[in-house]
Amino acid sequence: NKPAFTTFYKLYSINNYSHPKSLFFRAMCEYLHKKVDGTPDPLITKDGLTKIVKSATLFMFKFQSIKGGDSKDAIRYFEKVGKQFYGKNNLDPDWISSIFADALLKEGVDESMIRSSFINMDFYSKHDLAYCVLSLLESIDVKKNEDGSTSTRLLYSQASAMLSHIKDKTFHIDHMLPQTPD
């Protein structure tokens, strides 16, 4: 579960989203909660923390980075989450995840919109987004099942490792894009 958490947290950090900060802070505080005597007493599980980070980051990544949605439109969903849990003991990762999934549908963000955005997007002007997308695509593992169908999964460790190098100039977009000889 740690690679999944770090993958989505890196996506959040690379894209410099501001709206999830308070939600992530609260979720991490609940995960790191201790009893009065100092012994660990997490209010949410590691899986719950990962689910919150994943759902909020994917919402921002799909809505703001890919669709180009306005930050002012995104904040209302984070406000809804904040109001729901203000003064309460712990967050509900399933409820939070469903809020962001519903928000994407409400904002018209679906698979066809994402494909259309990718076709028309100038990734050279959006270096960090291009690097994130290519890192995720490169980390997809496709397996053929016995019944002839295929299944896909994201290799979180690989994605996390690739995303770690976005700021250190180890790779350039030109290294990741297919090259056509002249």
Regions found by a protein language model. Give the residues of each.
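Short helix/strand-bridging catalytic loops that position acidic/His residues to coordinate divalent metals
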Residues: 38-45, 159-162, 182
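Histidine-centered nuclease catalytic patch
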Residues: 164-182
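Short, contiguous, well-ordered secondary-structure segments
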Residues: 135-163
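Generic recognition of flexible, low-complexity loop/linker segments
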Residues: 7-14, 158-163, 167
